């Protein structure tokens, strides 16, 4: 797997997809900007470093629990020629705000999204039914305010579920408030679950790669706490709660992709 990792190419791919996301906004699509950009690097390493072969018939499972970040997932599908821009545009012909993933719209979507906090439970079901496959789940840190997340974690721990990899996009902000001081992400607390706990810089491609590689080899489930920045890549967007629901002017957006 390591021979497939080219740090320079991965960094360039992140930059490329980040610009493609901004261009979608310029074209009239409206998405949750901050939370999409915070997890972009995590997904680029996952899908472009041979960890997750999304086009494979016998692939693992991926659940984007924070479904409001679906834009980057769709951009990856388009980039891999698994989704056409025309189909994306048709699906969003009214170009309403946001959107969610739907298993009936794509064979590459493994679970519907919408209400937060439920994908871990779904992941448990998939893991039990598919014990030889890895279940990758990307969750937002704000989802840990949902009791269903903790119930799922306790179940994974108590029943020694072995094949789930949970990636926490720890951007320290929900849609409306800061969750920077929450102590639930302290490794000491999570270690009580007796799972493999790792903490990384969620924008350092090399660190992400090494972490994923380690988790792939583990014989028990893992939790990755990825410290990220909401709106990563553009200073005007970074850690700005306004852009959880608002979109900058076209002039500002165009200035970002010059």
Residue map of PLM features:
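N-terminal capping segment at the start of a domain
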Residues: 13-30, 169-170
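Glycine-rich beta-alpha junction loops
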Residues: 41, 68-69, 171-172, 204, ...
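Non-catalytic, mobile gating and regulatory segments of ester bond hydrolases
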Residues: 1-10
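Cofactor-binding active-site loop characterized by glycine-rich and histidine/acidic residues
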Residues: 21, 31, 36-159
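Generic beta-sheet signal
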Residues: 60-62, 133-137, 164, 218-228
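Glycine/aspartate-rich loop-and-adjacent alpha/beta segment that forms the canonical ThDP
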Residues: 205-258
